[in-house]
């Protein structure tokens, strides 16, 4: 069943200039956990892209492996390729789990010559990240939904225009077999404390808190200059590149490196408010944050 949310999802691809034929001629890596957000991503991509999809699932040993089995059978049902990663030892922190996922995703991206990594981060995740950065006294820059890893390979987060409530509605409408991971309710993780304790408290103080702040974050994320491909960025006048980079908060040396050294691609690490420049000829040596 085709819904208006499919149109919004497809508009994200058009905004990011990902609707060209060459974008769909390579495989797409989909990070699928089995939760409602990731299954929405899988359903959208399966309906709109139709082929060249690779489902990637990570098992951090936080709970039983039944979620991996469910994602595996769902991939088989949709006739999609499947990749499975399981840690040798249990991972104890969110930061280690994040680094483990992205390290393997980026390595798999280069090994398979895939076009992009797609993750199922929503506006609700962006709000939690914003609060986490604010509480941790880091500059709250939010999440970039498109990051170029090399000249043609990207990290794409197409669900940032949706909230968790909207993805829940989508799973109900399409009868998607979502998996509720027990680790999402463990208060030992800071993100779960924000999700289940702080945000409900703030919404109780101000019922419009979630809507207002999410709208402000979305307005910043949807800046069209953020999603321009590298060749479009390099074609902009130098004075305009300088003005945009200054608004992003880059230092003078970073601006000079961005404008005058075209062999580097820009990767933004939103958790530490720094910019790293990655040599396209190498594989990967940089951090990416949720």
From Swiss-Prot:
GO terms for cellular component: chloroplast. It catalyses: cytidine(34) in tRNA(Ile2) + L-lysine + ATP = lysidine(34) in tRNA(Ile2) + AMP + diphosphate + H(+). Keywords: ATP-binding, Chloroplast, Ligase, Nucleotide-binding, Plastid, tRNA processing. SUPFAM superfamilies: Adenine nucleotide alpha hydrolases-like. ATP binds at residues 33-38. GO terms for molecular function: ATP binding; tRNA(Ile)-lysidine synthase activity. One of its GO terms (biological process) is tRNA modification. Its EC number is 6.3.4.19. Its main location: plastid. It is found in: Plastid, Chloroplast. Pfam families: ATP_bind_3. PANTHER family: TRNA(ILE)-LYSIDINE SYNTHASE-RELATED (PTHR43033:SF1). Belongs to the tRNA(Ile)-lysidine synthase family. Ligates lysine onto the cytidine present at position 34 of the AUA codon-specific tRNA(Ile) that contains the anticodon CAU, in an ATP-dependent manner. Cytidine is converted to lysidine, thus changing the amino acid specificity of the tRNA from methionine to isoleucine. This is tRNA(Ile)-lysidine synthase, chloroplastic. It comes from Cyanidioschyzon merolae (strain NIES-3377 / 10D).
